[in-house]
Amino acid sequence: MITYFTPEKIDRIEDNEIFVFGSNANGNHYGGAARVAFDKFGAEWGVGEGLTGNAYAIPTLDKNMEKVTKLKLVRSFIKFIEFANENDSKKFYLTKVGCGIAGWTIEEVKEILWVAAKACFLECKLPSNIVIPEEFCFSNPELYKLELERGILIKRAKMAVTDEELEMIHNQILDNESSINILKGDLTE
């Protein structure tokens, strides 16, 4: 089953899943999603950025507990996106990074995320193994779901073993693209 958007509350994850949270540069995981990462997913005290346990820290506050600059947050998101892209066997659940204790708005973080995505891929897209909060969705959520499914189908096609399997996936991709085109048409009318 495909998980399209990060659940509001995450209590448990599988071994191949990573909880992505906002942290401070000191790696002091006192509250919010950082505390959840520390208590439940093995985030280490003192690690303010990167993979730590079954969690990934994105610093939204600096060492003085002030908001990081937008540029620093973009750079941290770029590092995260590149890391997720290089670790495509893992699924990353991005929480509403920075929108709690750090005080960033949903719109600010959403914009920063997609600027970082564009910097990585020269278009507004994320690797299909990154699950985002619905509020961070740049386009229509239904269109985003279909585009995510297309990315997963393309990955499966690359791993197909038999001609029959490849043909079945190819037909699913065509159906998916047809649905995307229909939805895009509905959005422009």
Predicted feature locations:
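Macrodomain-like recognition of ADP-ribose-binding/processing modules
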Residues: 1-146, 152-153, 185, 189
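Generic short amphipathic/hydrophobic targeting helices enriched at N-termini
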Residues: 148-150, 165, 169, 178
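Charged, low-complexity interaction regions
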Residues: 155-168
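Amphipathic alpha-helical coiled-coil segments
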Residues: 157, 174-189
